[in-house]
Amino acid sequence: MFARLDAATGKHRQELFQQLVAELVRHEVAEEEILRPVSKHDAGEAIANARIKEESEAEGLLKEMEKLDPGSAEFTSKLAKLRREVERHAESEETKEFPRVAAKETTERLEQMGRAYEAAKRAAPTRPHPSTPNTPAANLLAGPFAAVADRARDAVRDALKSTS
């Protein structure tokens, strides 16, 4: 997705950026609801909190980027930074977090988490907005999209309960 976004121009670049935002937010909502609680226990608070911090930094960058013209040099620079941050975050998950979770959880539990993760990604909105507040009360005040995001989180939590 990053390579396609780098090469795109005009309206197509804006559309691809919106798709990237949607995919990143769906991914992070799913991780936030399913992986992080388990990770804090299995991998430790420091590792889980480092991943949360990385996600927060990427979210901040997305908020900055949404205010910019996608054709601007500043947008392109921030896009390159975002790509580096996302790649570094994924590598940290793969090398520091996932192996510790996998070592402490049963195969059945890991499969359950995988199913819940996929359900979460399907339930999450396809047009997320990175500047949406991150609390349920603020989400309700922020508008319909935010309420949908809360409903997606609730659906994920319900799915987790029904698969446990």
Language-model region placement:
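Small-residue-biased structural context
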Residues: 1-164
